[in-house]
């Protein structure tokens, strides 16, 4: 009788599992911070403009730190840079707990890798996306590892959002005032940052980008200096992808969670508690869709999966805009959310698969920056549309149409550019 036990995820190295755990801890922290940060700043007396500047600082951090990671992480060391960013994450939480001085808080927001968008788009993501292919021992698991990475992050983010209710519990159980009860979550955030530092310290040298090797005339091996840049061919590919992803992200900014929440509240008078339930169910559907996306991609390819799951989701987005009743709107919205993020793990897998190994960090970073910049602009445009047009659902229609156009352009430009593993099939 065979008594050997199968180790779960045996195809994933120890480093890969540590990266997954770091993503869970980080996403959980981002989850509750994304809910409580603006509320806390309002409670301690800052006006909407000052709050907006702090939130903008977090977006600037995402762009600047991702840019630094894109071009220096492989030279300095991926592990070192991850540790440095995690230390800054912990320090920022401590600053928010310790003081209400505006200069200190806006500085903490800029240096602290704080994420308040409800999804993770920062520098950690770019470095980890480049590392993941080196943590699997089976090339066929490439799509699966990105699906797993995104799925656990989504579940952890949802759990973090639920944890944002802890201040209310502390108020009733221990008689704390609202401000002090929220401030304790900054202690938790800082502590989780320390935990992430510990996880990154445990990573091995295997996660680093490998130096190129050349052979001299005497057959001795010589290490070439590591250059964190893209070849002319990769620049062309990543340039096109970045432009297209920027369009997709811009369209996505029309239907970020806060705008969808506003739409449900305004059009149907939905209670905030019900809205939170809708988003929670949507989060679960999204998380499971990542694994389904990996399975589909293994069968039909990454580009086909990205396009032919995305187009139906965007048609559903437009349909939601014309839903006459709340139940119909919820059904179509949830159906849309079950499909809309299936391009995320497949997109990440495709980016690192079509460039050389030493180009992965730069490729992931550049494409993430393009998404961050355009998505930061579109909510303001959506607000202008809502204010200018009599049609409350206009952002849904605009977003859906632009996204469908993106899908069509992506398909016709990249349908024949298959990653090496797909070409072998």
Residue spans of the language-model regions?
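Helix-to-loop junctions at the C-terminal end of transmembrane segments
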Residues: 65-77, 168, 289-302, 386-387
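Central cavity-lining transmembrane alpha-helices of secondary-active solute carriers
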Residues: 53-71, 159, 280-292
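Transmembrane alpha-helix termini and helix-breaking/packing motifs in multi-pass membrane transporters
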Residues: 38-39, 43, 158-180, 267, ...
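Helix-loop boundary and gating motifs at the non-cytosolic
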Residues: 6-64, 237-279
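C-terminal ends and interior cores of transmembrane alpha-helices
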Residues: 87-103, 312-324
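Hydrophobic core of transmembrane alpha-helices in multi-pass small-molecule transporters
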Residues: 24, 92, 102-123, 328-342
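C-terminal membrane-cytosol helix-exit motif in multi-pass small-molecule transporters
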Residues: 164, 190-212, 406-414
